[in-house]
Structures are given as structure tokens and as C-alpha cells.
Amino acid sequence: MTRVVAQGTFDLIHPGHVHYLEDAAAMGDELHVILARRENVTHKDPPVLPNRQRRDVVAALDPVDHARIGHPEDIFAPIEAIDPDVIALGFDQHHDAAAIEAELADRGLDCAVERASPREARYDDEVLSSGDIADRVLAQRGDSDP
């Protein structure tokens, strides 16, 4: 059985997320998804939704076999526990595949690192970014406190 790991923030799920997970699932037989903890998201605004809610939504998606929240300190700890054959990176994720491969080798994990294919918008106003969804909500409904 080929185990695949996909990872990300998965805040405000959109068609790009679904495409990434479908692509990742096609790389093997079993898809494990690791969701970044809110406190570990430093490369962009933190997620709007809580960790458990994001995990539960991702777990409910058809391509996903297992979903878990990432480790609070060591992003590779869940990868070691899963021992995947493939890590599927999103086509636009900021991760350096070579650095990931080096860390996997240092930890004794024999695992390929692949990039998922991009998902192009299928119509003019389709939104494929959680940040863009949040911006659109603020623009249409106002920037007021709930």
C-alpha cells in the first residue's frame, strides 16, 4: 500500500484545496493529511477557523483517508509516525522540496517528494485562495467585528 501525505492550512476550503487533495490521493492508495496548527502558520495570516474544525472538514472530503493536526513543535513528527511513501506538496506551497528531502533522509525516511498540479479557475469569478475568499467577504459584508 502506498501512503501519501499532503499538508497545509486548509482554511476556508475552496476548489484548489479539493484539487490538491484529489491529485495527492491519486499518487497512492491511502491519503493522510496533516493540517498546520494555527500557531505554526507564520508565512501568511493565521487561519480563521480553529484547528479541529479545519481537520474535521478536511477529514470529511472524499479523497482523504486520515486527517490530523500537526505537531506543535516538529513538523516532521507526524510524517515519521505515518512513514509515507510520498509527500505531495501543493503546486504553490512555499516549501523547498530539496530541503524536505534532505530532512527526510536525515531522519532515515525513504520518501519521494512530489508537487501536485495546478488548478486553474474554471470561470471568471471562481476563487481559489482562502485569503481571496476572506478579502471578498470583507469587501462585500464590511470589515466589522462579529
UniProtKB/Swiss-Prot annotation:
Entry keyword set: ATP-binding, FAD, Flavoprotein, FMN, Nucleotide-binding, Nucleotidyltransferase, Transferase
The EC number(s) this enzyme carries: 2.7.7.2
Domain of life the protein comes from: Archaea
Class of the enzyme per the UniProt entry, highest EC level: transferase
One GO BP annotation of this record: FAD biosynthetic process
Cofactor list: a divalent metal cation
SUPFAM superfamilies, sorted: Nucleotidylyl transferase
Molecular functions (GO terms): ATP binding; FMN adenylyltransferase activity
Catalytic activity line of the entry: FMN + ATP + H(+) = FAD + diphosphate
Amino acids binding ATP: T9, F10, H14, P15, G16, H17, D92
Gene3D superfamilies according to UniProt: HUPs
Xref: InterPro entries: Archaeal_FAD_synthase (IPR050385), Cyt_trans-like (IPR004821), FAD_synth_RibL (IPR024902), Rossmann-like_a/b/a_fold (IPR014729)
Biological pathway: Cofactor biosynthesis; FAD biosynthesis; FAD from FMN: step 1/1
Subunit structure: Homodimer.
Family recorded in the similarity comment: Belongs to the archaeal FAD synthase family.
Function: Catalyzes the transfer of the AMP portion of ATP to flavin mononucleotide (FMN) to produce flavin adenine dinucleotide (FAD) coenzyme.
Name of the protein: FAD synthase
Source taxonomy: Archaea, Methanobacteriati, Methanobacteriota, Stenosarchaea group, Halobacteria
Encoding gene per record: ribL
